Amino acid sequence: MSRLVVVSNRIAPPDEHAASAGGLAVGILGALKAAGGLWFGWSGETGNEDQPLKKVKKGNITWASFNLSEQDLDEYYNKFSNAVLWPAFHYRLDLVQFQRPAWDGYLRVNALLADKLLPLLQDDDIIWIHDYHLLPFAHELRKRGVNNRIGFFLHIPFPTPEIFNALPTYDTLLEQLCDYDLLGFQTENDRLAFLDCLSNLTRVTTRSAKSHTACGKAFRTEVYPIGIEPKEIAKQAAGPLPPKLAQLKAELKNVQNIFSVERLDYSKGLPERFLAYEALLEKYPQHHGKIRYTQIAPTSRGDVQAYQDIRHQLENEAGRINGKYGQLGWTPLYYLNQHFDRKLLMKIFRYSDVGLVTPLRDGMNLVAKEYVAAQDPANPGVLVLSQFAGAANELTSALIVNPYDRDEVAAALDRALTMSLAERISRHAEMLDVIVKNDINHWQECFISDLKQIVPRSAESQQRDKVATFPKLA
C-alpha cells in the first residue's frame, strides 16, 4: 500500500496530544495512521538550514522537521505568506505589503524544502500539501522529476479575480498550482473563484464537472469542508468544571452569556462585533444588567503593525462601551487578550447562551462547529454566525448574519437571547447532525480517496504533453 506524505508549514510533534494540537493535526494523524507515512514540516525554530533533518518515528509514522534561517523565515513566512497572501486571500488588499525580496524568499524556501523532501520520497508515495505557505511546492517537486500523485488543500478562502489578480505575481502562482493533481477547497465559492482566476489567465478546458486542463497540465478541483471531532469535544465540554470556572458560573447564574473566542486577527471582524454589541445595548435596553459578552482574543503576529493597531482599537472600544453602559455591579463587555486551554474553552462554550462567530472572511471557522458540538443537547446555546464564514454553508440552522451590518447582528443577538427552548433544541440538533456526518475523519478520508483515484503523472505524461494550451482571448 502506498505511503502518505504530508507537508505543512508546521508539524505537530509526536509528543503533542492530538486533542491539544487542534483539528488539522487530528485529521492528518488519522490519515497517516491509516496508511503509514511521513509528516514533513518546519520545526518552528531558526538555525542552520544545512543541519540534517530531525526525524522521529512512532508506530508507522515518521516526523521529519527542519530549521529555517532568520532571513528565510522573515521573507517566506512573515513578509510574503503573512503580509501578502494572508491579507489578499482574506480580501484585504489594503493591508498587502508586496516586496520583491519577499517573493524571491518565498520561492527560494519552497525550492529548499523540495530539495530536503526529495531524498525521503518513494515512487508510490501519495503526497498531500497544506495551505498558502506552499502554493509552489508541487511545481518545485515536478521540476525535480517527481511524478507522484500530489494533492493540495487550501484552508483559507480563495479570492475572486478582482482581488487575486492584483497580486504582482498572480500569474506565476496560478501556473504553479496547476502542477497539483487535486486542488481541494473549503467551499464551492472558493473552488469557483480559483477557476475564474485561472480562466482570466489562460484557456481552461473542463473535461468533466471537476476535471480540468490548463497550462498544459491536467488536474481536478473539489470541495472538502474541514470538520472537527464532535465526540471528543462533547466529552471535554461535559466534564467537571475547574473550581474557578464553577465559581464564576455560580456568580453568573442569572446572567446570559455571549461568548466569542479567536486569535487576534483583522479577518475575524472584532471591531465590527464590538459595535454590534453596542447596538444591542442601545436598541434593546431590556437586556441591561442581564447579559455579559466575553471576547477572548489571544495575540497573534504581535510584531505586525496591523495586528498592533487592531489590539489597541479593541482595548479602546471595550473601555468606551463599558464606560457608556456599565453599572455598579455590571460590566457588559469583558475583553481578554490572552490564551486559554482548549479543553477549558469547550467547557465555557457549554455554559454560554450564545456563541458569536462573525468573521469578515474565513475559510471555514472551526470555532463555530466546536461551539455546536460542546452544547448540552437538552439545553443548547444559540450560534450567531457570519455569512462569510465557510461554516455558514453547512450550519444553516445558525442565525446567519452580515457582520458589516451591526443592526442585523444586534437583532440576531436579541433573538438568540430570547429564543424558546424548543427552537434552540431543534436548531442545535440539525447542526449537530451535519457536524457528526462531516467530521474531521470524513474530511481526510474523502480527500485521500479522491487523490488515490488519480492516475500518477508518470503514466499520463506523454498524453499530457500533447495537450495544447492557448492564452485567454479578449
Swiss-Prot record:
Feature type site, description Involved in alpha anomer selectivity: W86, I156
GO MF term set: alpha,alpha-trehalose-phosphate synthase (UDP-forming) activity
Record's keyword terms, sorted: Glycosyltransferase, Transferase
GO aspect biological process, one term: trehalose biosynthetic process
Pathway listed: Glycan biosynthesis; trehalose biosynthesis
InterPro entries: Glyco_trans_20, Trehalose_OtsA
Binding site for UDP-alpha-D-glucose: G22, G23, R263, K268, F340, L366, V367, A368, K369, E370
Disulfide links within the chain: none
Major enzyme class: transferase
Positions of D-glucose 6-phosphate binding: R10, Y77, D131, R301
Enzymatic reactions: D-glucose 6-phosphate + UDP-alpha-D-glucose = alpha,alpha-trehalose 6-phosphate + UDP + H(+)
The enzyme's E.C. designation: 2.4.1.15
Its biological purpose: Probably involved in the osmoprotection via the biosynthesis of trehalose. Catalyzes the transfer of glucose from UDP-alpha-D-glucose (UDP-Glc) to D-glucose 6-phosphate (Glc-6-P) to form trehalose-6-phosphate. Acts with retention of the anomeric configuration of the UDP-sugar donor.
Subunit structure: Homotetramer.
Family that this chain belongs to: Belongs to the glycosyltransferase 20 family.
PANTHER family: BCDNA.GH08860, TREHALOSE-6-PHOSPHATE SYNTHASE
Name of the protein this chain belongs to: Trehalose-6-phosphate synthase
Organism: Escherichia coli O6:H1 (strain CFT073 / ATCC 700928 / UPEC)
